[in-house]
Amino acid sequence: MDMEKLKRMQARGGVRTGDGKGTPRRKVKNVHKSTGMDDKKLQTSLKKLNVQPIQAIEEVNMFKSDGNVIHFAAPKVHAAVPSNTFAIYGNGEDKELTELVPGILNQLGPDSLASLRKLAESYQSMQKAEGGEDKKDDDEDDDDIPDLVEGENFEDKVE
């Protein structure tokens, strides 16, 4: 057999790769995602708890201890009130508290308000530190501006 033809066939994947004459061709392993099975198992366990869907929930925010927030936009929520169980479906995003501040203030509890105060204090201290650096920069910039000539008033010339 021609070597070039053999290389083309190997590149296509139509040639046996193995030890000897009677070995079968290599099978490609298919990896199946099991998200469907997990979802079915979750649905059956929620059905056992007799959950009811809750409509008209626009967003869900879960506050973590490190100050970040897990934000669900337009989630599906199911609840079983007797067993105090809630299931939230949707794509959750990790966000910082500062990203959600304007619309989230009415949802904050006492713990979250304390973390918001700490965040505001740290933000103010960062601004003061940056402001101190800017003041130094302003002093350096003043060297480039020439002083006014004595005896001349530029405001009179503008009017």
Curated annotation (Swiss-Prot):
Belongs to the NAC-beta family. One of its GO terms (biological process) is protein transport. PANTHER family: TRANSCRIPTION FACTOR BTF3 FAMILY MEMBER. Residues 36-101 form the NAC-A/B domain. Residues 136-153 have a biased composition (Acidic residues). Component of the nascent polypeptide-associated complex (NAC), a dynamic component of the ribosomal exit tunnel, protecting the emerging polypeptides from interaction with other cytoplasmic proteins to ensure appropriate nascent protein targeting. The NAC complex also promotes mitochondrial protein import by enhancing productive ribosome interactions with the outer mitochondrial membrane and blocks the inappropriate interaction of ribosomes translating non-secretory nascent polypeptides with translocation sites in the membrane of the endoplasmic reticulum. InterPro entries: BTF3 (IPR039370), NAC_A/B_dom_sf (IPR038187), Nas_poly-pep-assoc_cplx_dom (IPR002715). The gene is egd1. It comes from the Eukaryota. Keywords: Cytoplasm, Nucleus, Protein transport, Repressor, Transcription, Transcription regulation, Transport. It is found in: Cytoplasm; Nucleus. SMART domains: NAC. Residues 23-32 have a biased composition (Basic residues). This is Nascent polypeptide-associated complex subunit beta. It holds the Pfam family NAC. Residues 1-39, 121-159 are annotated as: Disordered. Part of the nascent polypeptide-associated complex (NAC), consisting of EGD2 and EGD1. NAC associates with ribosomes via EGD1. GO terms for cellular component: cytoplasm; nucleus.
